[in-house]
């Protein structure tokens, strides 16, 4: 273990020990979660979901008792690319930011604190939100090592919000916050058997969140039920003058928990993206059970023959690479003090100089490609084309032409074996989340069962700013669901 990683591990251990020694009435809930972190995250199954805990969590829990409201006292974990005031750094999983203690809350965190939410700690993630290399292992970071899937310890937790997904599934907090550029909330939710919601881009602030792409980035809630995810979203959503994308958020947000308990599928027309269910018979069979439950709940199902446009993936990558170079530099230069790393080029140089910490398992080919992606005209053309393909000619057209309110497909295939040597092996061809990611539209993943003990989620995708109705559809599906949701085994697959 590198000496700096050992130091962070000691910080985590010391923080847990200090909080755990408090009086019985101080932070009872926090203490319960910390005991679970100690016994199944640090030792035993060693999930490696939590990077560090907040040493003031018990005090925050006590203070929250004076706050009235449904979020007061709720204990959450936060993905470690989101800034949280206090002693913990925001690293994005990289040793390049191991000293990035900014002393400030991201606006979305400030909103949650005002509502009485207790920040328990920071979660591991796919380093740089899975945008450093095309050969990466989801859930691995230089700082945090490899996060494990609590349903099958040798299987991927998906990413990049790996620790948030695994942590919620393992009961290490009431809920967690993840971030998504394309699949980074919904895929870990699916793989870990929990609910994950990627809201409409612009509903939640991205200020003081380590960026990949302002075109697609958004934080989102991860929880064990749609109701809990909606409640957490209530505290997260809102306008931020520092994030122009959120200009309309205060006017368009609502109480996302309203109507969940009585939401019905009766008469709701739902588009079925059959091709996006892949070719694996067991995944298709599980999807068919979910469709049967939707139909039994009163939904009208409309089969849709849709194929992803060949240009969409290419244009999306062009956008992400260009944004990465620009947005990362802006973030680094905006850090308090005199940050030593001020550009993507600086990060590339850091990784080369610290290859023993960062480059042992995979390289930085995406970083290097992004550094060379400087053609703004090509970027603007790719952005316009990808928005057209995913939005106007994608989700918008599919909803309107077929007269449906939502689109459904499996979120992902079963979790694949962790492979640090050659990287992720998700060749399932399952999922439609890229449409929602590129268009910036809402996408909910709700557990729909498991294949051989490996959870799979049902994706529900809706129109822009139709977040509340997407959540209502998810809650109605939860009630209609007849398939058992798997419980984490905390064992290797097949044991």
Residue ranges and their predicted role:
Residues 25-99, 128-130, 248-252, 257, ...:
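Short, well-ordered alpha-helical
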Residues 33, 73, 366-495:
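Glycine-rich, small-residue loops and helix-cap segments
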Residues 34-46, 55-58, 62-66, 113-114, ...:
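Sec-exported extracytoplasmic/periplasmic mature domains
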Residues 72-92, 259-273, 322-390, 445-455:
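Short helix-loop capping/hinge segments that flank enzyme active sites or metal/cofactor-binding pockets
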Residues 72-219, 244-247, 273, 407-424:
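Short glycine/serine-rich loop/turn segments
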Residues 76, 82-83, 216-218, 245-337:
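Gly/Ser-rich, acidic/histidine-flanked active-site/gating loops
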């Amino acid at each position: 273990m590198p000496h700096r990683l050992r130091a962070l591990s000691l910080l985590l251990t010391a923080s847990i020990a200090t909080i755990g020694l408090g009086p019985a009435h101080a932070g009872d809930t926090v203490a319960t979660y910390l005991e679970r972190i100690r016994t199944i995250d640090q030792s035993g199954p060693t999930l490696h979901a939590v990077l560090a805990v907040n040493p003031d969590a018990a005090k925050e829990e006590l203070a929250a008792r004076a706050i009235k409201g449904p979020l007061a006292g709720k204990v959450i974990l936060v993905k470690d690319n989101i800034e949280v005031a206090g002693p913990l750094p925001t690293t994005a999983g990289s040793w390049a930011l191991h000293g990035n203690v900014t002393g400030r809350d991201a606006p979305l965190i400030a909103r949650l604190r005002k509502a009485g939410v207790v920040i328990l700690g920071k979660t591991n993630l796919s380093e740089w939100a899975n945008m450093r290399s095309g050969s990466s292992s989801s859930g691995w970071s230089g700082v945090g090592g490899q996060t494990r899937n609590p349903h099958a310890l040798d299987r991927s937790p998906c990413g990049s919000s790996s620790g948030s997904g695994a942590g919620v599934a393992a009961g290490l907090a009431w809920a967690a916050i993840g971030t998504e550029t394309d699949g980074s909330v919904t895929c870990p939710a699916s793989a870990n058997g929990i609910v994950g919601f990627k809201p409409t881009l612009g509903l939640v602030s991205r200020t003081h969140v380590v960026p990949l792409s302002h075109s697609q980035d958004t934080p989102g809630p991860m929880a064990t039920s749609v109701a809990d995810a909606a409640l957490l979203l209530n505290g997260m959503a809102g306008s931020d003058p520092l994030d122009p994308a959120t200009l309309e958020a205060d006017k368009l947000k609502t109480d996302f928990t309203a109507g969940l308990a009585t939401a019905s599928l009766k008469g709701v027309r739902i588009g079925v993206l059959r091709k996006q269910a892949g070719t694996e018979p067991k995944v298709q069979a599980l999807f068919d059970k979910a469709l049967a439950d939707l139909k039994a709940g009163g939904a009208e199902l409309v089969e849709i023959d849709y194929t992803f446009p060949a240009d969409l993936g290419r244009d999306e990558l062009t956008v992400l690479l260009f944004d990465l170079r620009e947005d990362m530099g802006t973030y680094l230069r905006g850090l308090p003090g005199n940050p030593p790393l001020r550009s993507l080029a600086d990060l590339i140089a850091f990784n080369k100089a610290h290859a023993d910490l960062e480059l042992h398992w995979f390289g930085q080919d995406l970083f290097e490609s992004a550094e060379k992606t400087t053609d703004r005209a090509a970027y603007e053309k790719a952005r316009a084309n990808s928005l057209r393909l995913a939005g106007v000619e994608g989700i918008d057209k599919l909803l309107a032409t077929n007269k449906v309110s939502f689109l459904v497909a499996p979120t992902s295939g079963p979790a694949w074996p962790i492979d640090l040597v050659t990287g992720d092996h998700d060749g399932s061809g399952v999922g439609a989340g890229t449409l929602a990611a590129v268009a910036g539209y809402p996408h909910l993943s709700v557990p729909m069962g498991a294949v051989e003990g490996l959870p799979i989620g049902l994706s529900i995708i809706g129109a822009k700013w139709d977040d509340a109705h997407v959540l209502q559809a998810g809650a109605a599906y939860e009630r209609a669901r007849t398939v058992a949701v798997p419980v984490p085994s905390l064992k290797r697959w097949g044991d």
